[in-house]
Each structure stands twice: as structure tokens, then as C-alpha cells.
Amino acid sequence: MFTGIIEEMGTILEVAKGTHSAVLTIAAGKVLEDVNIGDSIAVNGVCLTVTSFDGETFTADVMHETLNRSSLAQCKRKSPVNLERAMPANGRFGGHIVAGHVDATGQIAGRKQDDNAIWIRVEAPPEVLRYVVEKGSITIDGISLTVAAVTAHDFSVSMIPHTAEVTTLGSKKEGDIVNLETDIIGKYVEKLLHPQEEKKETHITQAFLEKYGF
């Protein structure tokens, strides 16, 4: 689990693409301080498992489903990425609950400066927008942000200068693709309120049970 508070920006050094997967080698610093094989690191909001590392880089596999659902398929050498280690049990919860499981990608549809605030508008698919609420939390490329406004086709967030300086979102422009993860609490609430929609049709009815002596 992560919190959406980016620890540092890393740089992709190598992208080894397979038929339906890829292996990323990423240059980093802070996130390598206590890393071990098998640890989770969020890369632009995508939870990846460390498969090897040295003092300056780490390597992680990216599976077919992740490539299809996230922007990692577009990553190239020298691309900057947001990095966050999994939250320790005694860590501070600075953002919100982030699973590192990207729901879909969105596209930056607008960006404007308002005094010291940077407003970003993101177009998102319906399956994402259904869980986006005003004043709620949204993860954009691994960054925990507060939703300022929502429409039928997009949502807006306001970014402070510090976030722009220490994350990749500061250099994003209109038309760029970003990873989106909605607040998982909303998904659980929906399932609790509508449990029948998740159940598959069954042939075991009351009449069936009575017929066989139950």
C-alpha cells in the first residue's frame, strides 16, 4: 500500500520489451536506501516488484495487464518517473490509501496558472469518473491530489508549486497521458450497497432445496 506522497523522481535507463511484457531499469536514489528483492515500489502510480538492484538502479517486470491499463507502455529511455516505496507500518499517512493498481489512463485536457496554484483538467473514462467526487482524493501518476471539480467528462485538481517541482506532473502538458487510480473506499462502498450485481446466476433455488430434502 502507498499514500501518494512521491519520495523522488527517478529516470528510466532501459526498457526491454517482450511480446506482451517489459522490463524496466530505473535510476533512483532515496527509494534504494533500504530496498530488498521483492519489495514494492510505485512507478508513476503502478505497483511494481523489485527483481534486482544495485546502489543506483533497480529493475522491475511489467506484465501485459499493466501495460494495457497504464501509461508505462509509452515509457522511453530518459523518461522521468515518480517513485514511492510501500508504506511501512509505522509510517505517516500523508496522502490517502493508494493500492498502486491503476484503473485507467486519462488525458490532460487543460492546464492554467492561477497565482501560485496550477490547475489541471483531466479527461477520464466513465469507469473512473463514477468514483470521482468533489473534495475527494484521486491519484494521478502516483500523486495524491484533491479533486476540485467534476463534470460528466473530466475532473480538475489544483497543484501547489512544491508538487509541481518534485513530481513529473510539473512538466506535463495538454494532451499528455497520465495514470489514474480512484479512491478504493468508494469501490468497496459500491459493492456493499449493490452486492447482488456481483453474484452470478445460480440454479440452487428454494424449490430445488426442498425437492432434495433440505
Q: Predicted segments — roles?
A:
Residues 1-214:
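Conserved loop->alpha-helix
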